[in-house]
Amino acid sequence: MRIMGLDLGEKRIGIAFSDPMGWTAQGHSILQRKGLKKDLSYLQELCQEFQVEKIVLGLPLNMNGTMGPKALETQEFARALQEALKIPVDFWDERLSSKSAERVLLEADLSRKRRKELIDKIAAVHILQAYLDGGSLGKDY
């Protein structure tokens, strides 16, 4: 089963895909956000191209596990995504995924500009790989 992983941001969406067996996550691209309709249209094209059967969306919970404004916005995006694409959407706790991605990029000794370009894609990989390794949060959020 091919799964798409997304790291949703205000300006960009990091995109990753699993291999066809659903074992490993690979970074794909970064979508510069251009409005909900255009974002959904692009993601739909990718889902068709890669024959995606499920989408995993990083859920930005607060450090104490509660949901703040960003998590609520993510849920709204997930509802729109599932309605438009007719593909199940699951959540994964993304706390510290961007920090983890930044650490990887720092260790790779990339420039600040290059790190900024890649961080969302790497965060999407971290979210998706964690999901593949550990199961899902389900629909409780």
Swiss-Prot record:
So what does this one do?
Could be a nuclease involved in processing of the 5'-end of pre-16S rRNA.
EC number, as in UniProt: 3.1.-.-
Any single GO BP term: rRNA 5'-end processing
Listed A to Z, the keywords are:
Cytoplasm, Hydrolase, Nuclease, Ribosome biogenesis
Q: Supply the InterPro entries for this chain.
A: RNaseH-like_sf (IPR012337), YqgF (IPR005227), YqgF/RNaseH-like_dom (IPR006641), YqgF/RNaseH-like_dom_sf (IPR037027)
**Localisation per UniProt entry:** Cytoplasm
Q: Which organism is it from?
A: Syntrophomonas wolfei subsp. wolfei (strain DSM 2245B / Goettingen)
Question: Where does it primarily localize?
Answer: cytoplasm
What GO molecular function annotation could you give as one example from this UniProt entry? nuclease activity
Which PANTHER family does the record cross-reference, listed alphabetically? Answer: POLYNUCLEOTIDYL TRANSFERASE, RIBONUCLEASE H-LIKE SUPERFAMILY PROTEIN
Family matches, as CDD domains:
YqgF (cd16964)
What protein name is recorded for this chain? Putative pre-16S rRNA nuclease
Q: What is the lineage of its organism?
A: Bacteria, Bacillati, Bacillota, Clostridia, Eubacteriales
Family indicated by similarity: Belongs to the YqgF nuclease family.
Q: Which GO terms describe its cellular component?
A: cytosol
Checking HAMAP family in the record gives: Nuclease_YqgF
